[in-house]
Amino acid sequence: MVRKICVFTGGRAEYGLLKPLLDEIVISHSLELKLLVSGMHLSSEFGLTYKNIEDDGFVCDEKVEMILSSDTAVSICKSMGLGMIGFSEALERIKPDIFVILGDRFESMVAATAALVCRIPVAHIQGGELTFGAIDDQFRHAITKMSLLHFVTTDEYKKRVIQLGEAPDRIFNFGAINVDAMKKIQPLSKSELEKQINFSLGPRTILVTFHPVTLENGTSGNYFSQLLKAIDEIGCLKVIFTKTNADTDGRIINDLIDLYVERNPKNTVAFTSLGQMKYISTLHYISAVVGNSSSGIIETPTFKVPTVNIGDREKGRVLASNVITCKQSIKAIRSAIEKVLSGEFKDSIKDMINPYDRGETAKNIVKTIREYELPITTKKEFYDVSSTLL
């Protein structure tokens, strides 16, 4: 019997992580892939990236528009309401056997809620992680409680999902889905990459991705301005910016990026989305990654790229030795960037390993989705952890 697997994607970064899984589902004779596409994929402001999905040969079976042209807290709540309406209707039409959701964004939270109410089993990827500075932290744990199957990326995260009351026999640590796939992608040559992004990569080029700290009020502009001032103080840097997601106050950061690039056209460039190939290729040729994105923590260790993680947004994640965390201040950011650009630091991470890399992640997830015996209902018991284990 063929199982119908619906996979949700609400944005460019998420799709890049999911693509290896989609490829594996497609080649499985006992699985049928359905894609539910929403969020930033359908927004012109964020590049209409659903077209990238279609260019890769996939069919967007359902498209649910939900993003409003505002990034206030109230607007995001309204977007979530629109998503709930659209997702429930889409799931009713698709009628999947399993609904796959990755991560922790508000779009994913709404999708999981709709699936729970519609009594559709959810398979959640990357649960158990911590990001104390982002509202995604609460969303992630809530999605965990609404899910039947859990695919975590480290043993530490597996323990945390158990601590949330999920049975160990429904939790699988296969590593990060994108890490294994990234190693298999042949990057563009440096000259071809420079041609495609219309930007020359110098010996001191950094990639900057900075998102709002969504559990704080009104800090986005000040925090990002501190980063820009630190870059100015260091001097002689070439900077590639990738813009933020559709988070509260994200447009403040994007506007500052546009203004900075306009004032510094010779040594800066900005993209709404680099796309997976250009992003991976960029990691091969830059000197450092700077910002507060999970990609800087999970993906850069594979390429041994020196990385600065700023502030508390990603606080709580497992860190590889190529990542150093600094406080949110001009002085601290400048010091951290100067440190990771040093030859001494680069030499110190030559033999490092990526804690999120376990190999064949997508294949193992698909095998589990294909073979796991689904219960008749979505009922599940709370798994109590022995007091001796706490």
Annotate each language-model stretch with its function:
Residues I101-L102, H150, G275-S321:
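A donor-sugar binding/catalytic signature common to diverse glycosyltransferases
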Residues S342-L390:
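C-terminal amphipathic helix plus adjacent low-complexity
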Residues K4, F8-G11, G16-V26, M66-P168:
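Active-site and donor-binding regions of nucleotide-sugar-utilizing enzymes
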Residues I53, L188-Y285:
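Donor-nucleotide binding loops and adjacent catalytic segments primarily
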Residues F8-T9, L42-S44, S147-N222:
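A nucleotide-sugar donor-handling region in carbohydrate enzymes
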Residues E32-I76:
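Conserved nucleotide-sugar phosphate-binding/catalytic loop shared by glycosyltransferases and other
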Residues K34-G39, H150, I240-T244:
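Short internal beta-strands
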